[in-house]
Amino acid sequence: MRLAIAIIGVVLLGGGAQASPETLRFVITRNSEQIGTHTIAINRSGKEISVSLSTNLTVKILFVTAYRLQHNETERWIDGKLLTLNSTSDDNGTRHTVSAAAKGTGLEVKVDGKATVVDANIMPASFWNPELLKRPVMLDTKDGQIMPVSVRDGGEEDVKVDARTVRARRYTIDSRYSQDVWFDDQGHLVQAKLVASDGSVIMYRPL
């Protein structure tokens, strides 16, 4: 069974430079059962931002591993522009390496050693950078595919987070798959949701 599971990373929307690193941890569930974790580490120094992301999940059905994903990624940004990106993925046995580097007015992307130059304004689909919500195309950092994207503002909703109810704005991001993310009025991620190819509900919630 192959599950289409997005790699979701989110930080605060906006905000100024921070001297200390940020580490964000999320638990990933499938139909309310924990299947993995997602971690984002962000270091800010003036106009430079370095980001490390890690996703590890395993889906078991009747004690048999049906799907496994391991993804590790680093990004380096200066003054809002992507300088370099490197990722490795093991998607249920299918391995990919993806890299990107600024080259002239474009972005050179290498997928499993094959290079192409794309528009420098394409955003990685790691979702930590809220600028992605404004762009029509993104780079899937798991396998290097260039994907058109559209974003719909679903308005504000009440979302239960542990024992609290949080007022949050919902965005639906449509691309190879559709997923929803919710942000509170401070720009914090409240939760994320997508429906996998087998109909199961995948949720990302902060630890």
PLM region spans:
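Bacterial N-terminal signal peptides
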Residues: 4-14
